[in-house]
Amino acid sequence: MSENKCPVMHGSATTTENSMANMNWWPKSLSLDILHQHDHKTNPMAADFNYQDEVKKLDFVALKNDLHALMTDSQAWWPADWGHYGGLMIRLTWHAAGTYRIADGRGGAGHGSQRFAPLNSWPDNGNLDKARRLLWPIKKKYGNKLSWADLIAYAGTIAYESMGLKTFGFAFGREDIWHPEKDIYWGAEKDWLLPTDNDNSRYSGERNLENPLAAVMMGLIYVNPEGVDGKPDPLKTAQDIRETFARMAMNDEETVALTAGGHTVGKAHGNGNADLLGPEPEDADIHDQGFGWLNKAKRGIGRDTVTSGIEGAWTTHPTQWDNGYFTMLLNHEWELCKSPAGAWQWQPINIKEEDKPRDVEDPSISTMPMMTDADMAMKMDPEYRKISEHFHRDPEYFSKVFSRAWFKLTHRDMGPKVRYLGPDVPVEDLLWQDPVPTGPKDFNVAVVKKAIKETGLSISDMVTTAWDSARTFRGSDKRGGANGARIRLALQKQWAGNEPKRLASVLSVLEPIAASHGVSVADVIVLAGNLGIELAAKKAGFDVTVPFISGRGDATDEMTDNESFAVLEPLHDGYRNWLKQDFAVSAEELMLDRTQLMGLTAHEMTVLVGGMRVIGTNYAETGHGVFTERKGALTNDFFVNLTDMNYIWKPIGQNEYEICERETGKRKWTASRVDLIFGSNSVLRSYAEVYAQDDNKQKFVNDFISAWTKMMNADRFDVS
């Protein structure tokens, strides 16, 4: 008998090195993993744990005092530069929040995801593991009342306060996740920091960055600080900066403020040989305990630290908030040089001794300041230069703009202001928060519903309009949704996916009802959709009441940043069987991505698609996927006929199929890829079979209503 190599009978591979998962065998199959991430089985907290309730018990004053004390409590295992951890903590917060991109709302500081791969091991996040370990005693002390996500975001804000900046405010309420995010596309590259011309480049054409990406390279948060592809050229770097920050929803003034404010304090580290650094946290030895980038061949701390490879401080006084960044940048001429680690950077020509920053360990030693290629862009690019000179002339204005931009950076993915918690929430409503006024709550729902019913609007029109209003919701950054009824405003009512003519006709009926009954249009739209579902269920033989929560408000054009909202325009909607155009990505993959953003599960997606097909909500009333003889009734016919082996499916064009009777060949229905995926994909078929069962007709209706209600209330953060 041969000796076994491993004494453990694994159910599956427990490391990725030698595993062959289903996706390796069948790479073209549709993976539903992004819909099942952050399952309760990964969460160590009790099922009834509510972080929003728990954080309200936090001693906010004590926490702030503890963080202030931490800033100057230098630890021998990772000493603070100049005795102050401010620069390190600001970088920690920056690099957590800075992953946000407006295109899909993913990334950002909202979930504490920097604790996990890949972010914890990105080259650009070098040595931020040290910052999190420095924060651990505080996290340990405050426990469940303080999430890692809130602590990481708060640390940088307090760091600025401790160095003299009057901050704009701070809000708590970010809830931790417990394993890496699966839904975020960081790029197709297989290696870190590859130049533009790599085989899996994120650029096309002259320099067109792939959507939804914002960073210029795999493993970077923003741009390459040494220059485009590591080649110094401030004007070219300025183009990258402008594109990257725009994709983070920042304008030129905010970009200059954030760049300058981020580099007013702290320093970059490159005083040594980067080749001597150990592996990143995810690849570190087990005895390193998640500590990465260890310099085991040298002292590797203090003045000998190597992180980015760039070496030096930007300002004369790197532990105080002042206008020194612009003084240093604009009052000197600069020349290219290389750091001790071999990185490109810029150094001032003929700088006075008194203008040099001190050594991080010995104040009697002066050091040469530096600027990155990105900093030089603030001087060389004409528009950035104007803003920089304005900030230099008016330090108070610079501080004001920066503090607001910092607040925006650290809160952009938190959603509406109603989600903000804590004593330092700013009173002012900001346009980028997508404000929505509170709507009337106390009205007779039955009377309004009766008025809607008497209009004679079709089931399809009522359900479709409510769906189109709600489907803009993104769980990633908590934007969009039915609250606010922005579907009736100038921008959204012209979106192709909203069928402008049909929408205008429906709104012309619903808006007078809202006005005459003193309720919001937002509530009337949702209530009409609910009524449509109830009528469709009645046609199928079920008397149901769709749950309704009043209180939605109506936003105005003045409350809406059209440029920011433009990214919410649907370019596809598998639920309504619609593509604005043909895309390189398959229709079913697009539906999966949209489903994840809306916060739905795979079985919720399944039941909603099946129900909406038979109700008749397809875009432009196309017949694809309407597998029923009882259109308008909420039946399980879609699933019954999809799983019926009396039919055969044939492609007749791109994303178009016909369903024929197997024996006669007679054409019965037509379908899209989105329809057929529920019979083709083995997991989705298993759900389809559940809803096709003879004993699950009531379950189908109940589950549809549950998923529908979830969507209608997805953005109701004002209710529990």
Swiss-Prot record:
GO terms for cellular component: cytosol. Binds 1 heme b (iron(II)-protoporphyrin IX) group per dimer. This is Catalase-peroxidase. It catalyses: H2O2 + AH2 = A + 2 H2O; 2 H2O2 = O2 + 2 H2O. The record marks 91 as: Transition state stabilizer. Heme b binds at residue 263. Residues 1-21 form the signal peptide. It comes from Shewanella denitrificans (strain OS217 / ATCC BAA-1090 / DSM 15013). One of its GO terms (molecular function) is metal ion binding. Its EC number is 1.11.1.21. Formation of the three residue Trp-Tyr-Met cross-link is important for the catalase, but not the peroxidase activity of the enzyme. There is a cross-link at residues 94-222 (Tryptophyl-tyrosyl-methioninium (Trp-Tyr) (with M-248)). The keyword ATP-binding does not apply. It is an enzyme of class 1 (oxidoreductase).
